[in-house]
C-alpha cells in the first residue's frame, strides 16, 4: 500500500511537491460500520508543511464495481454545492484521488449523531438539493447491482446462507412492482451510511465517499437512510415527511422494499470482499451476516407483500 501511495503522490507532485509526508488516516473496519474497507486514506503534507491534503486509494478488490471518473465528477459537483471536501485531481492508473483535507475539528459521524432530527433533516435537505441538479450521467439500480454481485459470489466459494436464494427470489417481484408503479431518476450521493458523513464545527455536515454516486430513484436512498438510522418504522416515517412534505403509505412502502434490496446488495458485496481480499479474519462475514439477517427479517414480515401491493 505504501508503494501505491508513493506512486500516486508522485503523479500529484505538481500539487503536493516533490517530497510530501504522508500517514495513514483511516483504518478499515468492516464490522459493524463498513468503514474505509473499499479504500485507503492518507493525510498528506507538503515538505515542512502541515497536512492539507487527503489521498484516497480505491481498493483493487472492487475496481470492477466502481466508476472512479463518475465518483470524481460527482464529488466535484457536490463540493460546488458546499456539501463535500474539494476533489483536486484524480489519477486513473493509480485509482487515486487527492482531496483538500478537512481541518481539525471534523470527525466521522456515528448513527447516534445522525438520528437527531435536526441533523437528519439537514442530510435530507442536502440530498434534495443534489437531486434537483443535473444528472450524474451514470444510471444505477440496486437490482442490477444485485445481479452483478450474485454472479460473482455464486461463481466463487462464497459462504452463502442457506436461504440466500429465497432472499434473491424476492428481488424480481420487488423490481417488477417498482417498475410498474413508475419512478423518477435523480442524481444522488447514493450511500448514506453514517461513516460517509463528516461532522464539523457549528453542526456542519459534509459527504464523503462518492463511489455509489449515480442517477437513482430518490426513494432508494431515503429507504437506505431510514434503515441505517432507525430500528422501528414509527421512527422512520418522519424522514419521509421531511423529504416529501407529507407522509404517504405508497412512498413509505417503496422506501421499505428498497431497504430489503439494499441489505441483500451489501451482504453480497461484503462476500465479494471476503472472496477477493487477503485473509483478514471474519469481519466481512460478520457484516454480511448482519445484512442478510436484516434482509431476512424485513422480507419475512407478515405485511411485506402488502407493501409491494401498496406501490
State where each predicted segment sits.
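An alpha-helical support segment within catalytic cores of ATP-dependent transferases
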Residues: 4-23, 132-190, 200-202, 247, ...
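Active-site acidic catalytic loop and adjacent metal/ATP-binding pocket
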Residues: 31-55, 172-220
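ATP-binding pocket architecture of kinase catalytic cores
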Residues: 32-33, 37-141, 164-165
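A glycine-centered beta->alpha junction motif in the catalytic cores
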Residues: 59-60, 98-114, 132-135, 148-158, ...
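Short glycine- and hydrophobic/aromatic-rich loop-to-beta-strand nucleating segment
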Residues: 95-99, 192, 229
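Extended, well-ordered alpha-helical scaffold segments
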Residues: 119, 162-174, 280-295
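Active-site activation/catalytic loop segments of kinase-like enzymes and analogous catalytic loops
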Residues: 219-250, 260-279, 293-294
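ATP/Mg2+ or Mg2+-diphosphate-binding catalytic cores
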Residues: 269-311
Amino acid at each position: 500500500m505504501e508503494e501505491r501511495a508513493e506512486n500516486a503522490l508522485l503523479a500529484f507532485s505538481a500539487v503536493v511537491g516533490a517530497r510530501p509526508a504522508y500517514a495513514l488516516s483511516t483504518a478499515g473496519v468492516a464490522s459493524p460500520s463498513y468503514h474505509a474497507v473499499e479504500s485507503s486514506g492518507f493525510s498528506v503534507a507538503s515538505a515542512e508543511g502541515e497536512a492539507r491534503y487527503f489521498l484516497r486509494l480505491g481498493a483493487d478488490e472492487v475496481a470492477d464495481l466502481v466508476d472512479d471518473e463518475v465518483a470524481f465528477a460527482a464529488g466535484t459537483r457536490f463540493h460546488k454545492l458546499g456539501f463535500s471536501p474539494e476533489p483536486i485531481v484524480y489519477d486513473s492508473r493509480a485509482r487515486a484521488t487527492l482531496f483538500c483535507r478537512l481541518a481539525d475539528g471534523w470527525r466521522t459521524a456515528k448513527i447516534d449523531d445522525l438520528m437527531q432530527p435536526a441533523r437528519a433533516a439537514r442530510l435530507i435537505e442536502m440530498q434534495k438539493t443534489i437531486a434537483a441538479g443535473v444528472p450524474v450521467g451514470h444510471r444505477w439500480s440496486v437490482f442490477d447491482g444485485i445481479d452483478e454481485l450474485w454472479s460473482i459470489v455464486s461463481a466463487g466459494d462464497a459462504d452463502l446462507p442457506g436461504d440466500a436464494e429465497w432472499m434473491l427470489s424476492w428481488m424480481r417481484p420487488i423490481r417488477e412492482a417498482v417498475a410498474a408503479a413508475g419512478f423518477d431518476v435523480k442524481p444522488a450521493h447514493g450511500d448514506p451510511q453514517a461513516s460517509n458523513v463528516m461532522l464539523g464545527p457549528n453542526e456542519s455536515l459534509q459527504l464523503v465517499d462518492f463511489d455509489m454516486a449515480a442517477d437513482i430513484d430518490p426513494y432508494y436512498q431515503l429507504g437506505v437512510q431510514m434503515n441505517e438510522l432507525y430500528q422501528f418504522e414509527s421512527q422512520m416515517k418522519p424522514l419521509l415527511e421531511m423529504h416529501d412534505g407529507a407522509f404517504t403509505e405508497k412512498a413509505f412502502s417503496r422506501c421499505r422494499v428498497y431497504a430489503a434490496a439494499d441489505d441483500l446488495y451489501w451482504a453480497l458485496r461484503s462476500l465479494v470482499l471476503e472472496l477477493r481480499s487477503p485473509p483478514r479474519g471474519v469481519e466481512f462475514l460478520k457484516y454480511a451476516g448482519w445484512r442478510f439477517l436484516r434482509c431476512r427479517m424485513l422480507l419475512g414480515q407478515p405485511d411485506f407483500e402488502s407493501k409491494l401491493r401498496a406501490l
